């Protein structure tokens, strides 16, 4: 029978529940358990696909094409399980399902209420998402005390009655502030947060205290006393310079032993040697490299979370410190490319909308003309193609129809038909809804033999994840190739969509329509990012 660990948060948001939950999962996995993770989001949006990156941060795409919370990216980076659509659901999805059942008459004319109908649907989705694993770790989004979270908290409260104490465990993450003016650590916010949880029927079994310093034993005793938690179950989680140190931090305080005792699990000791190796590589780099990331969401770097982590993973596997310089594409558009001078490589990530596009094109041009390693991802590939069409292929004013419907050279245009992850033909036009209407999830790509792409991947058939609704217009491919652009990867289907491009006469110029960052992990890295960082290091060595 699957056992459930529920992780809640209190006092303030952005405490790092996802990292703490993923770290617990990593420790339990190292002890031989089959583990999965779920994220329950209390917002009413059906999914985060149409939400602004400035409000929500990155949208993480699963292999089966779900647009999900960025925490699922952390889950995949910390454990071996691959997340699916069922690993993340929202209030919007819950209500959508319940209302559909009511319309069908499934409730036999009964009054549909939050309890039991909404809470039953939440419990059903939790069980469905957990599947057949030893332990499912369920992170409840939001902060205890939020109105939006109440149905989710009630559902997980009921699950203890449904499955029993030996099969359920509650972990509460709370903020313990240090007041510098008084020179004191304050436990009262945590006491009140736990009090609020207990009022709705949930008694935490473990308290994780988020702090900027170590938690003294006296404060541990005080928290344990007032929160009705065993003293050894009050765990300190301190600010770390790498999120990959958190599993070791929690394990050192015995959190996995407490969990195993509570859930009646007899397991071999944790083996965190892989994590120790990762930390050693982070702390002892042999070199450093500077990469310019030119985007429009740089004021909130969480918008590029998987991408920045993928670059760090490449640093781990090349024994180098990767310094990411986030550069606003609007500033490049307005002020020119001075901020790019001294960089060892340039990267233009994905994005949507017209704002800052010309700055990204300037960055591409700078990389091409100065022979600096360039990596373009999704929109970054489209920018590279547009720049090349304008400057090298004799198509002045070339553009994407996303930005200019009247362009004479629509080298990038809306995809009107493609085959999705499940093999179903999808069709779209300019009037289609924005939500859930992109080319999403893992798609097979065929790489040209002998190309840079094939050398990077060491294969000619790959699968990478997508999230976009505009594609290279195949009508202009012959003209672009005649001007020297190489199309090195295409989709495996009959539509033969352009997936990768490169410049044979450039030291390292590569761009892809897919999002390789979604499959990079600290354990294995990703071949594309490793090759990119190696190219940046080589450029640095040649230009000392």
Swiss-Prot record:
Region (Amidoligase domain) location: 1-265
Alphabetical UniProt keywords: ATP-binding, Glutamine amidotransferase, Ligase, Magnesium, Metal-binding, Nucleotide-binding, Pyrimidine biosynthesis
InterPro entries: Class_I_gatase-like, CTP_synthase, CTP_synthase_N, GATASE, GATase1_CTP_Synthase, P-loop_NTPase
The protein's annotated pathway: Pyrimidine metabolism; CTP biosynthesis via de novo pathway; CTP from UDP: step 2/2
SUPFAM superfamilies: Class I glutamine amidotransferase-like, P-loop containing nucleoside triphosphate hydrolases
Active site positions, chain numbering: 378, 515, 517
Ligand binding (UTP): 13, 186-191, 222
GO cellular component: cytosol
Note: CTPSs have evolved a hybrid strategy for distinguishing between UTP and CTP. The overlapping regions of the product feedback inhibitory and substrate sites recognize a common feature in both compounds, the triphosphate moiety. To differentiate isosteric substrate and product pyrimidine rings, an additional pocket far from the expected kinase/ligase catalytic site, specifically recognizes the cytosine and ribose portions of the product inhibitor.
Quaternary assembly: Homotetramer.
UniProt record similarity statement: Belongs to the CTP synthase family.
Name of the protein in its database record: CTP synthase
Protein's organism: Laribacter hongkongensis (strain HLHK9)
Gene: pyrG
